[in-house]
């Protein structure tokens, strides 16, 4: 019985400690995510989802065009 109570107290303490030591800005995490999504809807050209790159075996000019980042006349 004592061991069970001790385990419950330990779990509650560790749970509380996790919340206390969490990232200070975590309370605004959803708000920041919403603002970022709203910005991407207003400026679709700036969205990271619109990033286009070439798959391996496709001809390329620079490494920036390849999804892997490696270009030697063909994306690697």
From Swiss-Prot:
Keywords annotated in UniProt: Calcium channel impairing toxin, Cleavage on pair of basic residues, Disulfide bond, Ion channel impairing toxin, Knottin, Neurotoxin, Presynaptic neurotoxin, Secreted, Signal, Toxin, Voltage-gated calcium channel impairing toxin
Main location: secreted
Cited InterPro entries: Conotoxin
Prosequence residues removed at maturation: 23-50
Keyword Signal tagged: yes
Pfam families named among the record's database cross-references: Conotoxin
Disulfide-bond pairs as recorded: 53-67, 60-71, 66-75
Record's subcellular location: Secreted
GO CC aspect terms: extracellular region; host cell presynaptic membrane
GO terms for MF: calcium channel regulator activity; ion channel inhibitor activity; toxin activity
Domain of life: Eukaryota
Signal sequence bounds: 1-22
Tissue-level expression: Expressed by the venom duct.
Domain notes: The presence of a 'disulfide through disulfide knot' structurally defines this protein as a knottin. The cysteine framework is VI/VII (C-C-CC-C-C).
Protein family membership: Belongs to the conotoxin O1 superfamily.
Function: Omega-conotoxins act at presynaptic membranes, they bind and block voltage-gated calcium channels (Cav).
Record's protein name: Omega-conotoxin-like Ai6.3
Species the sequence originates in: Conus ammiralis (Admiral cone)
